[in-house]
């Protein structure tokens, strides 16, 4: 079986919340795709409940695209501690951390239920499992800790 980088990361050494560049891959035509670890909570210490994480996922899908060029996808980790962000091109971890911070700030302070996309049976595969309250509370908690652009030492942006 292929080795997966995420499973070789020593999860006891990282200091969440942070943004980490996992890899940059160059395709046959020269296009670059970047994969980032957006770690919101400390691994093996806490996990965001699925309803809140699901709502954060739906909101980040739009909010990150508003703040960062080339967003392909932002998908939650199964462990519920953060997200993979996949983009075209190269962005510094500082750039991504600022986009994440702005997005979480919007969730915490500005977003209302009417702003959450994909919350009915036609547009979401598990539309009953959402919580804007949880998404807001977790966003506030993450922002209160500061988002680092480095995974192993705190360099809060």
Curated annotation (Swiss-Prot):
Homodimer. Disulfide bonds: none annotated. This is S-ribosylhomocysteine lyase 2. It comes from Lactobacillus delbrueckii subsp. bulgaricus (strain ATCC BAA-365 / Lb-18). It is an enzyme of class 4 (lyase). One of its GO terms (biological process) is quorum sensing. Its EC number is 4.4.1.21. Belongs to the LuxS family. It holds the Pfam family LuxS. Involved in the synthesis of autoinducer 2 (AI-2) which is secreted by bacteria and is used to communicate both the cell density and the metabolic potential of the environment. The regulation of gene expression in response to changes in cell density is called quorum sensing. Catalyzes the transformation of S-ribosylhomocysteine (RHC) to homocysteine (HC) and 4,5-dihydroxy-2,3-pentadione (DPD). HAMAP family: LuxS (MF_00091). It catalyses: S-(5-deoxy-D-ribos-5-yl)-L-homocysteine = (S)-4,5-dihydroxypentane-2,3-dione + L-homocysteine. One of its GO terms (molecular function) is S-ribosylhomocysteine lyase activity. The keyword Cell division does not apply. Fe cation binds at residues 54, 58, 124. The keyword Metal-binding applies. Keywords: Autoinducer synthesis, Iron, Lyase, Metal-binding, Quorum sensing. Binds 1 Fe cation per subunit. Its cofactor is Fe cation.
């Amino acid at each position: 079986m292929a080795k997966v980088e995420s499973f070789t990361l020593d999860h006891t050494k990282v200091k969440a919340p942070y943004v980490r560049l996992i890899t940059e891959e160059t395709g046959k035509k020269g296009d670059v795709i970047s994969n980032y670890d957006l770690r919101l909570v400390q691994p093996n210490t806490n996990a965001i409940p699925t309803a809140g994480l699901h709502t954060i996922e739906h909101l980040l899908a739009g909010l990150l695209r508003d703040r960062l060029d080339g967003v392909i996808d932002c998908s939650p980790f199964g462990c519920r501690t953060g997200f993979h962000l996949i983009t075209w091109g190269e962005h510094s971890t500082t750039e991504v951390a600022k986009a994440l911070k702005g997005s979480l700030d919007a969730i915490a302070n500005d977003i209302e239920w009417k702003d959450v996309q994909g919350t009915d049976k036609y547009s979401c595969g598990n539309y009953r499992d959402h919580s804007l309250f949880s998404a807001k509370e977790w966003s506030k908690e993450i922002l209160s800790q500061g988002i680092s652009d480095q995974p192993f030492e705190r360099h809060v942006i």
